[in-house]
């Protein structure tokens, strides 16, 4: 009888041991966020980030838009809007990141745009911090995708998707009301002027997209670079000139710009640099401002090369 009991317990222990070795394994936890970023790199965030550094003015604005500003622990020196960004720790410029400050913030992820070098991306990742690049591929159109992606990363997906849909509707509405190409006024945006040379936005830039969405023609639409000659400027002889508000008085009083018909006719308008110089949610303000100027400007000339 004792031998039987011993064999029974031995059999039971072996069976339990065998069962334990083949117990079902716990399924691996699904990653919070997976995506191929704008640098075509596979991105995986295991957990929802709670501490985020943004080195892109556009991304920073979008985080405020979707209601995720409380997760921002650091921004670049160029992130100046909305005004609340003044209270957020600065981590340097887009070309001179202060890695020591950035590391001290213990971010879960760093969000970047198109102006960060691959060298800086590598340096951040070597510190063990994930980097996600979200480039607004075509400026205004690309802003909608940025809203969606930032919404997902910050757990504000519903708000991000809603704002993206609204943004696309705004673009479609303005395109629908734009005049025919032959009726568009030629607009010259002064990026730079004076002794250092003349500069304007060439084709395939977000500034050209802003001007065209406003129903106008970009004076630099045939250029591939930002610098232009005086001969080119006077040949184009733009209907309307836009210049940063703080530079408008100097521009209209400086020779030889005083000889341009737009200057003579009082068709030089100051514009907020934050609306047009960088890709931003405020680009739509520039679109509407330029569209209104084109509607109310007295000139009917449309100069073509």
Predicted regions span which residues?
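Alpha-helical, coiled-coil/dimerization segments enriched in small aliphatic residues
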Residues: 78-81, 164, 198-226
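Structured C-terminal subdomain patch of bacterial secreted/periplasmic proteins
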Residues: 142-152, 161-165, 172, 178, ...
């Amino acid at each position: 009888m004792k031998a039987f009991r011993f064999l029974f317990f031995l059999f039971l222990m072996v069976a339990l041991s065998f069962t334990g070795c083949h117990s079902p394994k716990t399924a691996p936890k699904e990653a919070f966020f997976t995506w191929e970023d704008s640098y075509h790199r596979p991105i995986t965030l295991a957990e929802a980030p709670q501490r985020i550094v943004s080195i892109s003015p556009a991304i920073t604005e979008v985080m405020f838009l979707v209601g995720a500003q409380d997760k921002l622990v650091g921004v670049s020196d160029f992130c100046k809007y909305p005004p609340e960004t003044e209270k957020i720790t600065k981590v340097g410029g887009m070309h001179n990141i202060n890695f020591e400050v950035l590391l001290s913030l213990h971010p879960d992820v760093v969000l970047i745009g198109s102006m960060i070098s691959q060298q800086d991306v590598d340096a951040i990742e070597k510190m063990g911090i994930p980097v996600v690049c979200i480039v607004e591929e075509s400026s205004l159109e690309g802003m909608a995708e940025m809203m969606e992606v930032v919404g997902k990363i910050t757990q504000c997906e519903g708000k991000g998707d809603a704002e993206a849909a609204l943004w696309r509707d705004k673009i479609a509405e303005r395109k629908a009301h734009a005049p025919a190409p032959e009726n568009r006024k030629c607009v010259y945006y002064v990026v730079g002027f004076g002794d250092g040379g003349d500069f304007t936005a060439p084709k395939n830039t977000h500034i050209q997209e802003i001007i065209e969405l406003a129903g106008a023609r970009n004076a630099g639409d045939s250029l591939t670079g930002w610098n232009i000659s005086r001969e080119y400027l006077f040949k184009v002889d733009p209907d309307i000139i836009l210049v940063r508000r703080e530079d408008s008085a100097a521009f209209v009083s400086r020779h030889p710009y005083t000889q341009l018909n737009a200057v003579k006719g009082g068709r030089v308008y100051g514009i907020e640099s934050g609306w047009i110089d960088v890709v931003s949610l405020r680009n739509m303000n520039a679109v509407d401002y330029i569209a209104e100027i084109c509607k109310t400007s007295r000139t009917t000339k449309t100069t073509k090369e």
